[in-house]
Structure formats: C-alpha cells, structure tokens
Amino acid sequence: MSVEFFNYHINWKSKAIHPGSHKSDQRGMGIEFAGHSNLLDYPDPRRIDLRMTMRDPMDQVYVRIFNQRSATPIMIFNDLSASMTFGQASKLERAAEIAEIIKNSAYHNRDAIGLVGFHDTVNDEWIAPLSYRPYLTESLIKKITSEKNHNKGSHGISKLHQYLPKDHTLIFFISDFHIPNEQITMFLNNARKHTVVPIILWDKNEYSNLPKFGITTFTDPETFEERTILLRKKLIKNIITEFNQRKKHLIKLFNSFDAPPFFVEGEFNPDDMTHYFNEYYHA
C-alpha cells in the first residue's frame, strides 16, 4: 500500500536551523543567492567569488553566500468533541485519516510535527510536542478513532493558545467547527503570528440526506439529549438553509484572518489539498 501525502509550501522564510524543503534566512549550502561577504566574516573558501575579489580595489577576498532550505514546524489541532463522533463513518475516523496524511507529508518534507487533541479540556495524554521523529504524534493519531467523548463539548479551544509554538508554524486545525463563533475568533486572534489551515469536516447526513417526511429522533452528541421532531418539507429546507448560512459565515470569518477554510464532506483527496496550497500560499 502506497503512502499518501500532499505537497505543501510556505510563503514566509523559515527561521529553523534544521535542513528541510522551505525557503529560509539561514546561511548554508543552499542554491538561493543571498549576496557577498568578506572571507574573514564568512570563512568558506569553497564559495570564493574570484570575479568580485579581482574587482575590489582594497584587495579583499569575497565569498558568495546562499540561503539553505530549512524545515518548518507543523502542528495538528484535532477536535475530539462529541459532535465529531457523528456519522456511520464518524468524523473522527476521517480526522484520523487526514492527520495521518498530514504526518506523512511533514515527514516527506523533513519538517517537525506535533499534535494536540482537545474537547472541553486539553489533557496531557493528548499532547505530542513538535519533533522530527513523529512517533508520539503517530501514536495519538491511532487513538483518535477510539475516542468516545459523549457529552463533551469543545471549550478546550480556549486553551490551545498555550500550545502554540514560538516560531511561525503551519497549523492544520481539524474540526467540524460546531463551535461558538466567539471561541473560534479568540483562537484565531491568539494564532495571528501563525498560518492556520482550517479543515472543516461535515457529514451530508447532518443536513442534506434527511428523510423527506416522518417522525425522527435526534440526539445532540454534546448534551446527549434526545429530541423527537416531525420532519416536513419546510423544516428540512430550514435545516439546509442554516447549514448553508453557517458555511458562508465560516468562510467569511476564516478569510478575515487570512485562513481560507478547506471543507471535507466525503473522502479526503490529498491532491485537493495540494491545489489548496498552490492557490492560497504561493511559494
């Protein structure tokens, strides 16, 4: 079975010393020309520029300096709340699949990766710090599908700022974002120095594949309360309208923070994520 991954790039210069695949400010053995320096300041005889040296009236020896390609930190924030258990193939199963592909992509680019899972709180057992050896992140990804956080909400989003890395980080935020707008806005404000990619998991059975008529029982996954309602054409239309309005609002909210959302309402296609980066984050 082939390993799935997508191609991504960043539109800022990494500050990481660790070699990788992205543009950086670090001097090294790269191919991006950064200028000249005196040999005494940058003692690397392999980089002597004879033409520049011969033209200098002060007889100084010059070397060419280049920027190396560096790694960049990658974080996954994964919603583990009760609403993520919805569906015959739950959103958590889809989240685990996507997180695995993100991990593969980071490994392919030689980037450090970490993961934080949350529901109403952030537990220590759901924290994998940034590392170039993604064993802990991988072990948490395998646990995602077994989470059964009935009666758990997503208030832990208000604690995520404590786990934001110091340096500019590419953050993949996996959630259905059935989260109050104020809490989403607060997180985005706290994460302004980072680049956030919201991956929004919705299940069409939540709103579009409802029975056309009849009595049905809904269970709120976060309060665990049951409600019996009579489905009729007008109510179904209202439900669909509300979801469409919610989608428009999320797009507007995330775009206002330069964080275009990526919606997943079925199978996740890594190629679509590659196209997303090509469209929104030019190298």
What are the functions of these language-model segments?
Residues 1-124, 170-174:
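An amphipathic, basic-hydrophobic helix/alpha-beta surface used to engage anionic
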Residues 1-25, 166-167, 185-283:
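Von Willebrand factor type A / integrin I
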Residues 42-43, 134, 266:
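Solvent-exposed, conformationally flexible loop/turn segments
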Residues 85, 182, 206:
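Conserved protein kinase catalytic core
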Residues 96, 150-154, 243:
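A conditional alpha-helix N-cap/helix-loop micro-motif detector
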Residues 117-142:
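Short beta-strand-loop
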Residues 133-169, 182, 201:
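Von Willebrand factor
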Residues 175-182:
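Active-site glycine- and acidic-residue-rich loops that bind
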